[in-house]
Amino acid sequence: MGATTYRVMSGFAAKGEPGTDSLAGMSKVVFSTTLREPLSWANTQLVSQEPVEAVREMKEKGLKSMRTIGSLTLCRSLLRAGLVDRFRVVTFPVITGSSGRERIYDGYPDVALEMISSRTFDRRIQLLEYVPTILAGPPGTTQSTPASTNR
């Protein structure tokens, strides 16, 4: 993951958000030239080396099972370099509309999503229905409380 994803995810983990406890025990690598040691999230290694070269070296040393979380720039560069073996898509219920570096939902505010229903069609397509809550600040920070009323 990159620095932005690390900040968001480690913030969720620090608050004990559901689903983050399993990540706490996993080894994690953060590619960043802006973060500094020590990192607060357990089992996290900071790598300031260029990510494509670092991942290539990790694979050459026999590390086979690696995953990315968020980090569109990182994912794109690894794909371009031919280092992506498989896509596993997981829907994470947060939209970083205003604080994400490369915004998929450009122009949207930051929104927390609460799933209210899900349905799978043809064992391929998932319909996920969420109730949005606009956040007062970036997800994973102390300011990420709901803004006034928006439901």
Tell me what each language-model feature is.
Residues 1-151:
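Enzymes that bind and transform nitrogen-containing heteroaromatic metabolites
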